[in-house]
Amino acid sequence: MRFSAIVLTDHSPAVFLQMVRDVEAAGVERLWTYDHLSWRHFRDKPWFAAMPLLAAAAANTSRIRLGPLVATPNFRHPVPLAKEIMTLDQLTGGRIDLGVGAGADGPDATVLGDEKITGRQRADRFHDWVELLVTLLEQETVTATSGSYAAVDARMTPGAANGRGLR
């Protein structure tokens, strides 16, 4: 049996990192942290950004796999997200995982001023977002359009830590 753990980003960075080290010491295989700008009852409480905390976790661990859970098109464009994941993969020596989802209604969906969308629109947007994200993670240079998402001469160098595409 394999174990994964979730450590929320509602803790100070120092506490978050101690929890990450404790989870790794316990032999857990994978650690996720929620990739939200705020979350549920934590909306008016401290909540830190996932990607910088994952970078710090990479520097404080050596074995455990790390990743955001879940990244969504609610506030993430595929180009900067792919660059962040590629960078985290390099920082971890290939120990990065990426959880993705369509995104739900709520603060993450409206914080950038976007209109609420239907479930069908959300599914279509997710398809387009994943299509471009996967292309970016697999290729060194990308010029592509997928629905309302575009990448023009986007560079994903040096790519995956293991020399293969990030899949």
Residue ranges and their predicted role:
Residues 6-10, 36, 71-73, 101-105:
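Active-site beta-loop-alpha junctions enriched in small/polar residues
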Residues 39-41, 73-76:
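Short, small-residue-enriched loops and turns at beta-alpha junctions
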Residues 13-14, 75-78:
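Loop/helix-junction capping segments adjacent to catalytic residues or to phosphate/diphosphate-binding pockets
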Residues 43, 77-167:
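Internal, glycine-rich beta/alpha segment that forms the wall or movable "lid"
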Residues 44-67, 125-136:
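Alpha-helix-loop-beta-strand connector modules within alpha/beta enzyme cores
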